[in-house]
Amino acid sequence: MGNCLSCCEKSKDEQYEPLLADREREAVADLLSFLEDRNEVNFYSEEPLRALTILAYSDNLDLQRSAALAFAEITEKDVREVDRETIEPVLFLLQSPDAEIQRAASVALGNLAVNAENKALVVKLNGLDLLIRQMMSPHVEVQCNAVGCITNLATLDENKSKIAHSGALGPLTRLAKSKDIRVQRNATGALLNMTHSYENRQQLVSAGTIPVLVSLLPSSDTDVQYYCTTSISNIAVDAVHRKRLAQSEPKLVRSLIQLMDTSSPKVQCQAALALRNLASDERYQIEIVQSNALPSLLRLLRSSYLPLILASVACIRNISIHPLNESPIIDAGFLRPLVDLLSCTENEEIQCHAVSTLRNLAASSERNKRAIIEANAIQKLRCLILDAPVSVQSEMTACLAVLALSDEFKSYLLNFGICNVLIPLTDSMSIEVQGNSAAALGNLSSNVDDYSRFIECWDSPAGGIHGYLVRFLSSEDSTFAHIAAWTIVQLLEAGVPRLTAFIQSSDDIIELLNDIVARDANNGEYEDGEGDVILLSGRALHLIEQDTDS
């Protein structure tokens, strides 16, 4: 602000004063007076703003410079919602041929653009066009301030699309490669702010942003690394852009893996999330494992910092979808940490990702199922499941349903009392939890050496197997009715006299089975799955009658 004061004081010099119009001399005097008492003056009020405006619109560059510097200092200390009478003179100063005036005016505009209402007004008053022009300035300070202002403007959702279509993305992308680290930071920060909608991401990709962002990943500046990594992570949300990345950026995965080993937790976190988003595609699921990402992900998984744990477990969840990755993940030592994360009750997302990963790992191999069970996963699931949030219950019951497919481990699951937690969950408020729990019970009911647990749980807890079968047979959802009818057939075909007697004496079950079979009369067309339900119900009734006759 010293420059501002000295410039205003110079106007009192005799040889300079005749060059000023009366209103400009008055404005200089008024501004000096206001500045002497600056802590008590509202510079956005009528008289101070009038003085600043007169100087801003002066033909005299020294007075314009004073106004620009004053605006820069005032807005640094006092940011509030302002009207066009404040912003318009600042925008006018941006058009000055003088680099110092441009620099100070862009600082003032960037300060004002911290306020949401001001952000919208700057764009409404065509400030973007002026800032784009400033970004093309040969002066680094002007570039830096202009890009910083656009970064602020781009945090307002209603501005993002306007910026994307304004022609700003090309200059921003070029300035992201600037040799000045401040310009790089501001430019990559602005590009990041433009990655939060599909339409804007399309505009970014069309502007050639991807190769620039990838080239900056090895930057020595943590902020630039963070902005670029996060931008790539957001761009990788879209399948079409993942395809583009796969075609044009062969070093991307290895660069992101290296960033998981940096000293900055926020960069590590975003690198893992970027890999997670890339791993939505089968190609990347394989490449990430083949590129030796597992040791770094395991290290992050064992961190005490929740965002790092969440990012890494989310990445592992996606990677584990591919059958070829199941054994490498298990062999890399992930099972114990994943089972431990089931107890992370302070973050249900972590719980969901951990148990979903276990389910994926169990999908195609008896060896993997055995490893998961040996890692004490069943104990953890049984202990936690009834008190877990619904989203976690859904994943846990789905995992149990997969584990219950294995004939080798059904008796283990039953003897561990898993029915006692699954039965109450068949009456959950969540349709998914109901269905998964019933599917797990159905899987356990087939080809078991000992059905004593089903006998013990026939009437309890929570209405027992009996109550669950009645609810599901009564359901309008053919999938639920199918699970119940299929389970009844399995229990009857097991040939356990006491279990068969329970079913035979259950008039409600028999009545519901008859109602389902009756739908077959004079009806040649069925909704999805209904025909199978009718066939299974008929099979169940046949087995009941057969056992009764014998």
Curated annotation (Swiss-Prot):
ARM repeats: 75-114, 116-155, 157-196, 198-237, 241-280, 282-321, 323-363, 454-493
Keywords for the protein's UniProt record, in alphabetical order: Golgi apparatus, Lipoprotein, Membrane, Myristate, Palmitate, Phosphoprotein, Repeat, Vacuole
Gene Ontology, cellular component aspect: fungal-type vacuole membrane; Golgi apparatus; Golgi membrane
InterPro entries, alphabetized: ARM-like, ARM-type_fold, Armadillo, Vac8
Alphabetical list of PROSITE patterns matching this protein: ARM_REPEAT (PS50176)
Modification Phosphoserine occurs at: 550
GO terms assigned for molecular function: protein-membrane adaptor activity
Compartments in which it is found: Golgi apparatus membrane; Vacuole membrane
Residues lipid-modified (N-myristoyl glycine): 2
Chief location bin: Golgi
Modified residues (Phosphothreonine): 548
Topology in membrane: Lipid-anchor
Covalent lipidation (S-palmitoyl cysteine), chain numbering: 4, 7
Function, in words: Functions in both vacuole inheritance and protein targeting from the cytoplasm to vacuole.
The protein, known as: Vacuolar protein 8
Native species: Schizosaccharomyces pombe (strain 972 / ATCC 24843)
